[in-house]
Amino acid sequence: MIVSAANNIANLQDEINKLNVFPVPDGDTGTNMSLTMQAGKNAVDNFNGGLTECADKVASALLRGGRGNSGVILSLFFRGVTKELKGLSEASPADFARAFKGGVESAYKAVRKPTEGTVLTVMRLCADRAAEIADSGITDAEFFAELLANAKDTLAKTPDMLPTLKQAKVVDAGGMGFCVLLEGMLSVLDGKGEIASHAGSSSEAGQADFASFNTE
């Protein structure tokens, strides 16, 4: 799942960069999130260990490789997730729901003045949705499909939460990056397979997703 997520965001980093207007329009959110996830991917590529050990490797690598504000927030989210998955050989939707809650708490603590309408909001409302459906008897694939749908719905509303985004007629870059990561994970869970790396180019699916967030 981590490899697929890392590949997906690497493929779409340039498109994410184009959305980057907050907190400063430096056009590097996609790059920073991609480089951060690449560190996690490298840590577990060809790794065949258990869930806990895999999660620990990813979290440690992300913390060491976190780039920029978005990368640091992402790395701390995964650190919180890892703490909740510790000791598990496999994870159910209920386990993932607790992990997402832990990830959000960890990410929010890292930001002195959290701003709504950013990736933090997308993460938080995604975790809230996870808690709502955790015990509904759905599969992991159905669970992540619900989370992705929720994240996209929240992302579409970010311009209404943050005036800078509305003025630029874009959605939040970090929030889009988080959606792209979930999309990569879901691809593995729902049987479509691991997304291949085509760094430097955008997949047709990715382009379609971005087109759906045209705020003009």
Model-derived features: positions:
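N-terminal loops that bind phosphate or other acidic moieties
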Residues: M1-E216
